[in-house]
Amino acid sequence: ETIGLAVSLELPLLVVAIQRGGPSTGLPTKTEQADLLQAMFGRNGEAPVPIVAPCTPADCFDAALEAARIALTYRTPVFLLSDGYLANGSEPWRIPETEELPDLRVR
C-alpha cells in the first residue's frame, strides 16, 4: 500500500530489495528471484513501477544510478532488485571520479 501511495503522490523513491536464498533444510543451494512478482504486481490497483536488476557485482553501482535517475526524472518509485550471489560476489571495479558521474538534477 505504501508503494501505491508513493505512485499516486509522485514521490521519487528507490526501493532496494536483496533477495535471499531459496527454500532449504539448512544452507540454501541456490538463490531465488522470489520477490520479482511481488515487485511487479504487489500493489493495490494500477500502480506500475519500474524495476531495475543488475547482472554483475560491478553493474550494481550503475544500476543504482540508473534507478535513481528514473525515480527523479519520472517522479515514481523504482525497485532495484538483486540477489544473494550479487550481494556476496565481487569483481574488479574502478570507483569513478565525481566528475564522471551523471548529473541527476531534475530540470
Please give the residue ranges for each predicted region.
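Conformationally flexible catalytic loops at phosphate/diphosphate-handling active centers
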Residues: 75-107
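Conserved catalytic cysteine-centered active-site region
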Residues: 42-47
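Thiamine diphosphate
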Residues: 1-39, 50-71
